[in-house]
């Protein structure tokens, strides 16, 4: 299988730190234990020296060399019975969304550390001061040393006005 490179344009909405550029002639460091582990499981998550460091705890590139690719549809804050969890409670909705993503990747035979890409769609009705909640919750699920690639988009609204966030994911599960 040919490697697939996913290059993600960063959207630094989840933090206020400033990106740092690497020196052009900087020596390359040996891969971290997490990077070696990810590579052994058919996915290499990394940040090229030629790009600005991410400011919001995600990887710029996910290289897939082998494994079963699983695409998870956008998840909203519905429980297994189809009831909305956390009406008007952004944190509760984010938590339920991540529980749904976890259930989906586990149903496919993997775990949350197999997730290599997260796409967030957040309703503009959410107070911007609440956006860091997404990262707080996310960090309790992902490998923060090698976080998935991510894109965060503010949308006018989701299909139903009571839905505050929707997240879709891509996972690569070792065969």
Regions found by a protein language model. Give the residues of each.
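Sec-dependent signal peptide recognition
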Residues: 1-8
């Amino acid at each position: 299988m040919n490697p697939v490179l996913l290059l993600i344009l960063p959207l630094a909405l989840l933090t206020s730190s400033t990106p740092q550029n690497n020196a052009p002639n900087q020596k390359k460091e040996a891969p971290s234990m997490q990077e070696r582990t990810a590579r052994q499981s058919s996915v290499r998550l990394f940040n090229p020296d030629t790009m600005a460091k991410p400011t919001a705890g995600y990887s710029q590139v996910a290289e897939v060399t082998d494994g079963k690719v699983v695409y998870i549809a956008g998840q909203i804050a519905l429980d297994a019975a189809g009831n909305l969890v956390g009406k008007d409670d952004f944190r509760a909705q984010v938590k339920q969304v991540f529980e749904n993503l976890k259930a989906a990747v586990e149903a496919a035979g993997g775990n949350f550390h197999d997730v290599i890409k997260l796409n967030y769609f957040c309703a503009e009705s959410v107070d911007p001061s609440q956006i860091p909640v997404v990262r707080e919750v996310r960090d309790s699920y992902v490998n923060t040393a090698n976080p998935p690639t991510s894109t965060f988009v503010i949308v006018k609204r989701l299909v139903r006005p009571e839905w505050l966030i929707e997240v879709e994911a891509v996972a690569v599960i070792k065969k």
